[in-house]
Regions:
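Alpha/propeptide regions of enzymes that mature by internal proteolysis
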Residues: 1-330
Length: 330
């Protein structure tokens, strides 16, 4: 995974690379998505593997960052072999962050290329990094009441499997998520809001019911006077595992991982979010024992890791200007 960002313009991108290719699935639940190469991840379509997933800010402009990843991979001979050269398959999704920094600052192919150059297997940074630098949450009452979102990660070990040499290896399921939700973020144990629509003067959260239809966004800081001004949201992420999955299995895991969002984001999958989760399988660990017949075990692990990654993205985020973070309102 690698990050690149514009710390003045407050936008960035995060890439997850699979140089040897990874079986991929995707599930788009929000109604305002910005995505790239998602159709080919459907089980009925030809291409079996992708080589990277690019998560970016910049709204639809940010999809250009994936072209930088394509350039980086092509230079290294990585991609789908056509007989006339390789075509790297790079999926992607974007968040809307044009409202927090400069609306003219957008992830482009140069930033996407830099994220690939920065990629490593070291423990990843979280919070205000990569695609998470411009993320915000809690925009139910307008942007002026938003709090800082961010990028979070988590992983779990799910038993053991066999590698290509029949040696036992741990089966790992990890999550990367960029939390930029319309809704509030809640503690899954207590149900209390930890980040969301916040009255900075009264120093309290504005709503625990999250009923979007009750609010006049013009009164609360949006110039549009309706929830049409809230299309700038979206939580996007990737589940990555070494468990051997088919395209059908990867799509099922991506689908189940959305339950992790639903546990901690209230509301989620709205008309004003473009919530999208990808699932990648490197296939380095063949599932054995009980796991061999139960893809749902991988899906449940994906749900748990996504839930924790969302909370970590919020708790590791730092406030920007007048936008507070979770630690400052506790």
């Amino acid at each position: 995974m690698g990050h690149a960002e514009d710390r003045e313009g407050l936008t960035g991108c995060t890439v997850v690379m699979a140089m040897d290719g990874a079986v991929a699935g995707v599930d788009v639940r929000g109604s305002a998505p910005g995505t790239r190469e998602t159709d080919l991840m459907r089980p009925c379509n030809l291409v079996e593997k992708v080589h990277a997933i690019m998560l970016a800010g910049g709204s639809a402009y940010g999809l250009d960052a994936a072209c930088g990843a394509m350039k980086f991979l092509e230079e290294r001979g990585v991609g789908f072999e056509t007989g006339f050269g390789v075509v790297p398959i790079v999926g992607g999704a974007v968040i809307f962050d044009l409202d927090i920094g400069s609306p003219k600052a957008r992830p482009d192919r140069e930033m996407g290329y830099l994220a690939c150059k920065n990629a490593s297997s070291c423990p990843p940074a979280e919070g205000n990094v990569g695609a998470g630098i411009g993320a915000t949450v809690g925009k139910l009452h307008g942007f002026r009441h938003a709090m800082k979102g961010g990028l979070g990660t988590w992983s779990v070990t799910l038993g053991t499997g066999n590698d290509s040499s029949r040696r036992q290896v741990p089966v790992i399921v990890g999550a990367i998520v960029v939390v930029n939700a319309l809704g509030n973020i809640v503690d899954p144990k207590s149900g209390e809001i930890i980040a969301g629509a916040y009255d900075r003067d009264a120093r309290k959260f504005l709503s625990k019911t999250c009923q979007t239809g009750d609010h006049d966004s013009k009164k609360h800081g949006s110039s549009t006077g309706s929830l049409r001004g809230f299309a700038g949201n979206t939580t996007i992420g990737v589940i990555a595992t070494n468990a051997a999955l088919s395209k059908e299995g990867a799509n099922k895991v991506a689908q189940m991982a959305h339950d992790g969002l639903a546990r901690v984001i209230h509301p989620v999958h709205t008309m004003y979010d473009g919530d999208t989760i990808f699932a990648l399988s490197t296939g380095n660990a063949s599932l054995t024992g009980e796991l061999a017949s139960d893809i749902s075990a991988v899906g449940e692990a994906a749900t748990r890791t996504m839930e924790i990654a969302v909370i970590r993205g919020i708790k590791n985020a730092s406030g920007l200007g007048s936008i507070p973070d979770a630690s400052s309102v506790c």
